[in-house]
Amino acid sequence: MSTVKKHLTIDFDFDSELDFILIGISCPLRDYRLCHFISKYSSIEFVRGKEDYIDHKGYAKEKDKDEMDFHIVYEKTKLKKVSKSHFSMYRYCDENFEFEYYLLNNRSIEGTLLISELPNFDYFLLIKHYIDDEDLRGLIEEIKNIPEVLLAKELDPSSLKSKENLIF
């Protein structure tokens, strides 16, 4: 009697999960100063604070305290040693919760990069959900009008090798 082994392969495409727009910002300012100037030049009022420990259904979230303090935390294991990287994050939601804006620092507190293939960008502005092309161009121009901003450019997240770092 012969046995037949069947193999199941699951091909997961990250591109189907990338439902956001990504803007790269090169700027020597600290993150809180950049947030101040973005709110001054546009209508986006970023907030950095503690995330609710309870979700909208009343259940406790399965996140550790570092993640609740509006950090993105990534763990890497090298030679049986676990290292954590903490990236600061600021958030803004409009009144109707149609848009979510996240300002992410490309450099962690420990010195590692969130998107290692784009080391020249200091920050990333991630916009979840749909935004009109004209509104997007206007937002990029508003960011470019900040005197300390050297470069603001829309990026294609599907072309990035470390795009999974932007899914949270």
What are these model-predicted stretches?
Residues 43-55:
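Short, well-structured beta-strand/strand-turn elements
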Residues 120-168:
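Glycine-rich, aromatic-bearing surface loops/beta-hairpins
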Residues 52-63, 71-78, 155-167:
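Short proline/glycine- and acidic-rich turn/helix-capping motifs at secondary-structure junctions
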Residues 1-8, 106, 126, 155:
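Internal, hydrophobic cores of structured domains that mediate oligomerization or house catalytic pockets
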Residues 8-16, 110-119:
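Short, flexible, solvent-exposed loop/turn segments with mixed acidic/basic and small polar residues
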Residues 1, 6-9, 14, 147, ...:
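Long, low-complexity, intrinsically disordered terminal regions
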Residues 59, 63-108:
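Surface-exposed, low-hydrophobicity interaction/linker segments
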Residues 3-45:
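N-terminal, charge-rich interaction modules
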